[in-house]
Amino acid sequence: MPHHRASSGQDHLRAGWEQRLERSLPAPRVGLLWMGLGLALVLALFDSTVLWVPARAYPLPSEGHSVKFSAIAPPLQSAFGWQNLTCPACKVLFTALNHGLKKEPNVARVGSVAIKICKMLNIAPLDVCQSAVHLFEDDVVEVWTRSVLSPSEACGLLLGSSCGHWDIFSTWNISLPSVPKPPPKPPSPPAPGAPVSRVLFLTDLHWDHEYLEGTDPYCADPLCCRRGSGWPPNSQKGAGFWGEYSKCDLPLRTLESLLKGLGPAGPFEMVYWTGDIPAHDVWQQSRQDQLRALTTITDLVRKFLGPVPVYPAVGNHESTPVNGFPPPFIKGNQSSQWLYEAMAKAWEPWLPADALHTLRIGGFYALTPRPGLRLISLNMNFCSRENFWLLINSTDPAGQLQWLVEELQAAENRGDKVHIIGHIPPGHCLKSWSWNYYKIIARYENTLAGQFFGHTHVDEFEIFYDEETLSRPLAVAFLAPSATTFINLNPGYRVYQIDGNYPGSSHVVLDHETYILNLTQANAAGGTPSWKRLYRARETYGLPDAMPASWHNLVYRMRDDEQLFQTFWFLYHKGHPPSEPCGTPCRLATLCAQLSARADSPALCRHLMPNGSLPDANRLWSRPLLC
């Protein structure tokens, strides 16, 4: 059983955090209503777009087949014409929306215009446009009456710096304690025969209760393989029984199969579960739908894992509208209390009272799962580029990072180690949030023993470096692959081997394993689901250990070794990579992502370039990393 003991001074920490939270309510600002709904609509539907081109299953790279990093334009175009939103069109669109502010339109009128724009730009089918607008309009109008964004800033946000400059998310800094940073002290390897624990890691389950075998996997909607997707042409097969290689999520039976088949991968000391429970039908989700997904999957996890403690984190798909996580100063029906209260009720058997307290307020918590280890679960939606509520005030929402500093300082004072779990990886966050988090990790490198995230659906990592030289690797965040097939992937899960539960344990990651369900085999006539280990990290990559320096060295080995990179690329996609080859620009962009635990930091990739040139690294950074 977990120990869940309170840390000394924890009541003081909580009181200080709550006082800062009460002072954080921002003053309202004049808003841009029409622009807001258009922007949120595009961001929401973009969240469900196809990021990988459908492809047939590919053999292992050792069999001589190359694979490719697919460009972002074709899959987005096939989803709903996102490519139609060019920079000039974007600026015309948002200028027109801005002009409408002078008439102070009501919510219904704003929604009507947004639907017409969605249809005109072919962003999605008309029924999807209508449902998405009606779902988002009330919250977005509220946000945009409190915030301000020009057409140039909006298009810079959507299409990148080449289309406009935006700095609405102003720079801010977290205060670190005056306690001097101890000299860096890498953990000592465990003694031979020391206990090793296995931690199950689940992320991005995305249960679709509308999944229906035989339906069209390539429908016009953002999510297919479900009632309403229609039936495929006679020449094309329909959605498989256990899942499908397309823009589809999972039926409940596949998640039951995953949990039921965990035996060979265990036993587990504990489970880290980093969110995204509902499906990608973001245009038609109600609060009842989200709560149904939360309770159904929580009950399923508890049924199959029994007494094993489970520690969840909040994903960006838990809310509706998707990505909509208002900071705690937003009260009433538009707050996230409906969700946090439901999570606290569902997860109460796993979490102590003090963790439930902060979960109810801000969706994050800390606890002690075993002696000498503190677990911190972050609500990474407060760092998200897609969380439109942060347009009101993006400065350390909910005071979460300052609270994190206090938790880490208390752990350092006690001599404890810390694991951090969350959904969105720090390298994918808003710049100021990401840079502050990076600074915090650097300060507490001796205390941090592991960081674990999901969200990207693929198998990767992010390395942290010292801030002075950006050359000494000091931490690594592991980004585990998804359970869902979305998009064009095998279902999967991760198991971490960590230094075991004994006095003096370093609690660091020693190795990890990834397990998948091969859909081609499972969906074959008479096929049954068989979850098998895809690979072990240290064995496959030839790593001496799982420390940050080993992952750093792996990146540069993959830069120079094509075959090693192709192995990584195959595993990155859970054994089902895109069909086209991944050339040098693709390889460098992918490797750059592994070096980039800090957002908008091209200098982190400068050594990937042949001459170490920063301008070349800047061009590399501008490439889409997950397409």
UniProtKB/Swiss-Prot annotation:
More about this protein: There are two types of sphingomyelinases: ASM (acid), and NSM (neutral).
Binding positions for Zn(2+) 2 per the UniProt entry: D276, N316, H423, H455
Residues binding Zn(2+) 1, per UniProt: D204, H206, D276, H457
Reactions mediated catalytically: a sphingomyelin + H2O = phosphocholine + an N-acylsphing-4-enine + H(+); N-(octadecanoyl)-sphing-4-enine-1-phosphocholine + H2O = N-octadecanoylsphing-4-enine + phosphocholine + H(+); a 1,2-diacyl-sn-glycero-3-phosphocholine + H2O = phosphocholine + a 1,2-diacyl-sn-glycerol + H(+); 1,2-dihexadecanoyl-sn-glycero-3-phosphocholine + H2O = 1,2-dihexadecanoyl-sn-glycerol + phosphocholine + H(+)
GO cellular-component term (any): plasma membrane
Entry note: cofactor: Binds 2 Zn(2+) ions per subunit.
PANTHER family membership: SPHINGOMYELIN PHOSPHODIESTERASE
Protein name per Swiss-Prot or TrEMBL: Sphingomyelin phosphodiesterase
The protein's required cofactors: Zn(2+)
Site (Cleavage): D249, L250
Domain annotation Saposin B-type: ranges: 83-167
Pfam (any one): Metallophos
Entry similarity comment: Belongs to the acid sphingomyelinase family.
First-level EC class: hydrolase
Main location group: other
KO phenotype (gene knockout): Mutants infected with Pseudomonas aeruginosa die within 7 days whereas all wild-type mice survive the infection. Mutants are defective in radiation-induced apoptosis.
Keyword Secreted among UniProt keywords: yes
Protein localization: Lysosome; Lipid droplet; Secreted
Residues that carry a glycan: N84, N173, N333, N393, N518, N611
Paired cysteines (S-S): C87-C163, C90-C155, C118-C129, C219-C224, C225-C248, C383-C429, C582-C586, C592-C605
The protein's role, per its UniProt record: Converts sphingomyelin to ceramide. Exists as two enzymatic forms that arise from alternative trafficking of a single protein precursor, one that is targeted to the endolysosomal compartment, whereas the other is released extracellularly. However, in response to various forms of stress, lysosomal exocytosis may represent a major source of the secretory form.
First and last residue of the signal peptide: 1-44
SMART domains hit by this protein: SapB
Annotated consequence of substituting H280A: Complete loss of activity
GO terms (BP aspect): cellular response to calcium ion; cellular response to UV; ceramide biosynthetic process; ceramide metabolic process; cholesterol metabolic process; negative regulation of MAPK cascade; plasma membrane repair; positive regulation of apoptotic process
Subunit structure, interactors included: Monomer. Interacts with SORT1; the interaction is required for SMPD1 targeting to lysosomes.
